[in-house]
């Protein structure tokens, strides 16, 4: 639907007494512009019911008029007589226009881009990224090519991952990670793939998309479960091997004994094949909002792997810091069976505007002004739940009555309701602490406003990343004063003291609830630490005590003092089975205190380093590109910034850089016996073909060729290739030469078929590049080519025989 069509529908709706047959069509569009229009309708309906929503409506009206570049007539309506929103009206009921009317302290260019929904996409070299027949048919022939070469590398790398391996895949937001999940789930017949998703909203979103793409033939083929739903249905479907793809929350796996036991059993009899963890950086995310159940997943996974050593694990996220990678490898890899597919890239939609204030009152006034003038939907990040409540109260005083608060104090039921309303465009101001964000996949957030300084560049970037997920420009503003820097630095003092760490650890270790074995200790975390004021030793702990006790165990695990072999949740408390790696922590003496002191010092150093990196960057605003800070955190990303206080335009290090950030060589494919038979035990085979290559491609892919390389301008009818080989990769020569620069055996191994036609120059280059490679090479040509640079026929240079296609066909038919 075009902008003109949308504005015509909206204008008609207002003129026809709030009714329009075409409004239903608009509601089904599911586009950024249709969302803007529907928010206008929703807030007007609110206003008509209660005049207290007049400010909310006029804010939505400003966003609508500026985004569409239009004007509107609303019968019998009179705008507020202020300059809150830059609205101008020709008398009551007259035509309404909007002007930007932006304050001088904001970057007007960035604001305009966000209002106008400017597409922000990096320039890319076009690659020939054909789907293989398996994916083509699995997705019901909806696509013939991958979305991008990044998606192809991610999906094919995942599909080729051997049993028993863990694959970490870094791929940019919006790049199409979901296709990896779908293809893995259906790669092996009668198998189960479990996807661990951080939030219910993201779980439901992924479930709906999977059903839309896959179109399952049985009702239980794709399922999801979270607390409160019918657990019998899921457990029975697992037991009866009916599910192919199951979406779960980490809390379900840790806390629901029936679901966990059914998964462990499914692993034991080989039905449970793949464990996928989405937003995997949260698994080891540290700080005040760490997710205990996410951090305990590796212990449950150990039990699953014990039952099925062939279980594959996949860790997906858009970005990983070096520390996160190290921790994930330590906790999730077995016997060195680890592969990284790194397609890391900084976001191209984010524009940064850092605004320093002189006083608290100036900052407060600016926040109110920014909420009025910046594009919506807007997420306003604050430091604490009290700050969130105070800001909401301030907004209500000036007339905004349709905002929501999402903090660590928000209960689960209310969280679910808020997220549903947020995604359904029922409101457009979200006031949040760091508890909000991950997995809330609202695509059209136009502004992320930070009113505090986060604890690290990583946390800050993750919060900024809630915006612009539709690929359109997003403004990331931060307004701060010097007091905010002091508040950020005060976080360093929140690290547990040696006394408290020691007190919590030895209170748990020496509790009568703890069971000690020869090599293991079963620890009950519901123990009150003996340093607690007025506490009786070993009395029941409250929720805060349990959380801090878990924190200490996880901290010791991170320091490699112990490993967590199992984790369970019984009667509201976490029970850990741990293996002690450093036996010095079993004794409450000076040695143990020194060890704990060193852990505390390292924890303090890490927190201090993160905070100083961000606060130091604030001092350089305008002199240094803001995004260089992110390159320091995400070390494999190239320099890219869509705009900041130093520059308005795009700043990038390399143009059209190949997206694979490091070689992928953890394993190699083996050549099938049929292909070995065809090439007669040699490394290469030259096949002379008359006419189309397609019949030979079909036969050789059936025989087990792993990769087909075709000219970039060659069209290929995927529907005519009938192999069910899920690992088959089809690429163009541009991609092949990029992959050949380094050892990428995950993609270039086994047997590779090169379609060369009559191109002798290309043949000469291929012979040079593939010389002495470990994979088998089969060359398809129309005639024995003259290799000018070598002054020989191609058949003389190939380390193998030269055969006519009809001879090969006889051996294959």
Q: Language-model segments: what does each one mean?
A:
Residues 1-316, 321-347, 359, 368-376, ...:
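N-terminal helicase ATP-binding lobe
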Residues 196, 300, 316, 451, ...:
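Generic beta-sheet signal
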Residues 370-408, 413-434, 440-666, 740-744, ...:
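C-terminal helicase lobe
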Residues 539-549, 734, 776-783, 787:
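Elongated, non-catalytic scaffold/linker segments and compositionally distinctive motifs
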Residues 661-719:
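Extended interfacial segments that mediate partner engagement and assembly in macromolecular machines
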Residues 714, 736-739, 754-768:
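Glycoside hydrolase catalytic-domain context in secreted enzymes
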